[in-house]
């Protein structure tokens, strides 16, 4: 199966320029995907392009990841409604270094093979290009009529857009077009890939290559990822799902994939994993027979968490999930780092207690029915303890008068109270 066929069955092709597949079938070629460096981490919205490069390399071709250091200083108007904040060079360089470390989990940069991946930054070839030189060498080959016909430009100039379009952003497609020309000349790059909103910018590049060098280059875009319910992919109430564990914990990352709908799971497992058709068909069959067991979601969450983080991080995320949703022990609870603990219990009621009350030792009855109002009265607490319905840090409480001290704290500042099987309360000691 060739690269285009691989993407096609995975549902990863939106538009493809005629002749692309035939060109790729002639032998190894190079293709690039542009990556916005405005943060020091990729988020899962970037993963479609990254997976395209991964499949490209696996098919024997050479992937190039282009960090948009220069274009990131400007901003792409495609499908955006407002001008972006511009970043300085030092921040962009830092972001590039962080992004390369993440890309190395998907692409082989270190191989001696001729199709080893390469990372480039368009700031390196744009920084010394004068404005006069650029508009003379590049601008004269692309007409304003051609640029105005792009959907991204039309949308920003329409009556429904109140922000208009700055000249800076209008010039973006020329810069992206020049990137393609530069890589065509210097890296033998014949294909640019991206999201479907990038088609206009990519074809500006193929047109520039044709007019400047009389060359032939190709374009391929993937669909913008959507959710079955029409919601925006990759966003939660707390924002983006990042690949950096400091921004999104491996537990929260795992939970995101585990909780996608059945319809989305079957689509996403094709896009975001390397599982083959037979493996996915078998999982889909099991899902149809027993949807409550969620085999698609579980395998999707496993594959992508291991790929982005590690097998150990995945195992820890599964174990953390069991703390909230299944049987677990105090030992498992104590193994959680602070960030994961807070993610696991993000939705439970929280109470704050002064450290002085814990430092000297406080009885459980005073903690849960006085220092907090987890129980409305001490009598109610004693009654529930007697019935075996109270736990502290996942241990059943046998004595309502037991003393709680600093040795009981999780991560030196938390206590987890539980009433019955499902009601949790996080006590924060300050």
Swiss-Prot record:
One of its GO terms (biological process) is tyrosyl-tRNA aminoacylation. Residues 362-430 form the S4 RNA-binding domain. InterPro entries: aa-tRNA-synth_I_CS, aa-tRNA-synth_Ic, Rossmann-like_a/b/a_fold, S4_RNA-bd_sf, SYY-like_C, Tyr-tRNA-ligase, Tyr-tRNA-ligase_bac-type, Tyr-tRNA-ligase_bac_1. Keywords: Aminoacyl-tRNA synthetase, ATP-binding, Cytoplasm, Ligase, Nucleotide-binding, Protein biosynthesis, RNA-binding. L-tyrosine binds at residues 32, 172, 176. It is found in: Cytoplasm. It catalyses: tRNA(Tyr) + L-tyrosine + ATP = L-tyrosyl-tRNA(Tyr) + AMP + diphosphate + H(+). A motif ('KMSKS' region) lies at residues 232-236. A motif ('HIGH' region) lies at residues 37-46. The keyword Lipoprotein does not apply. GO terms for molecular function: ATP binding; RNA binding; tyrosine-tRNA ligase activity. ATP binds at residue 235. GO terms for cellular component: cytosol. Pfam families: SYY_C-terminal, tRNA-synt_1b. Its EC number is 6.1.1.1. It comes from the Bacteria. SUPFAM superfamilies: Alpha-L RNA-binding motif, Nucleotidylyl transferase. Belongs to the class-I aminoacyl-tRNA synthetase family. TyrS type 1 subfamily. Homodimer. Catalyzes the attachment of tyrosine to tRNA(Tyr) in a two-step reaction: tyrosine is first activated by ATP to form Tyr-AMP and then transferred to the acceptor end of tRNA(Tyr). This is Tyrosine--tRNA ligase. It comes from Porphyromonas gingivalis (strain ATCC BAA-308 / W83).
């Amino acid at each position: 199966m060739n690269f285009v066929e691989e993407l096609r069955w995975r549902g990863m092709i939106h538009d493809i320029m005629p002749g692309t597949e035939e060109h790729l079938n002639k032998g190894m070629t190079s293709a690039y995907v542009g990556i916005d460096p405005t943060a020091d981490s990729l988020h899962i919205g970037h993963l479609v392009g990254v997976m395209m490069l991964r499949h490209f390399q696996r098919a024997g071709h050479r992937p190039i990841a282009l960090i948009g250091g220069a274009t990131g200083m400007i901003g792409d108007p495609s499908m955006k409604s407002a001008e972006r904040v511009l970043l300085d060079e030092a921040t962009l360089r830092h972001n590039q270094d962080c992004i390369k470390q993440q890309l190395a989990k998907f692409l082989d940069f270190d191989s001696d093979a001729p199709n080893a991946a390469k990372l480039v930054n368009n700031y390196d070839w744009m920084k010394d290009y004068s404005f006069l030189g650029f508009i003379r060498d590049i601008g004269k080959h692309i007409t304003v009529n051609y640029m105005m016909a792009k959907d991204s430009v039309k949308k920003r100039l329409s009556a429904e857009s109140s922000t208009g379009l700055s000249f800076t952003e209008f010039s973006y497609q020329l810069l992206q077009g020049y990137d393609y020309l530069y890589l065509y000349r210097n890296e033998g790059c014949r294909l640019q890939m991206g999201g479907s909103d990038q088609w206009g910018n990519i074809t500006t590049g193929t047109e520039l290559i044709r007019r400047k060098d009389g060359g032939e280059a190709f374009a391929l875009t993937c669909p913008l990822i959507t959710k079955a319910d029409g919601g925006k992919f990759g966003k939660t109430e707390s924002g983006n799902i990042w690949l950096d564990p400091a921004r999104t914990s491996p537990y929260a990352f795992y939970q995101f994939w585990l909780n996608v709908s059945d319809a989305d799971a079957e689509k996403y497992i094709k896009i975001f994993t390397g599982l083959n058709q037979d493996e996915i068909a078998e999982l889909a069959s099991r899902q149809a027979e027993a949807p409550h067991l969620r085999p698609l979601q579980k395998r999707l969450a496993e594959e992508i968490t291991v790929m982005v983080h590690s097998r150990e991080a995945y195992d820890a995320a599964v174990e953390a999930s069991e703390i909230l949703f299944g049987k677990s022990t105090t030992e498992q609870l104590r193994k959680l780092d602070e960030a994961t603990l807070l993610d696991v219990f993000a939705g439970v009621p929280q109470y704050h207690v002064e450290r002085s009350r814990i430092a000297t030792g406080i009885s459980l009855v005073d903690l849960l029915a006085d220092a907090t109002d987890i129980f409305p009265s001490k009598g109610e607490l004693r009654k529930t303890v007697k019935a075996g319905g109270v736990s502290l840090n996942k241990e059943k409480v046998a004595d309502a008068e037991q003393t709680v001290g600093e040795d009981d704290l999780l991560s030196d500042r938390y206590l987890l109270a539980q009433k019955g099987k499902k009601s949790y309360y996080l006590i924060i000691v300050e």
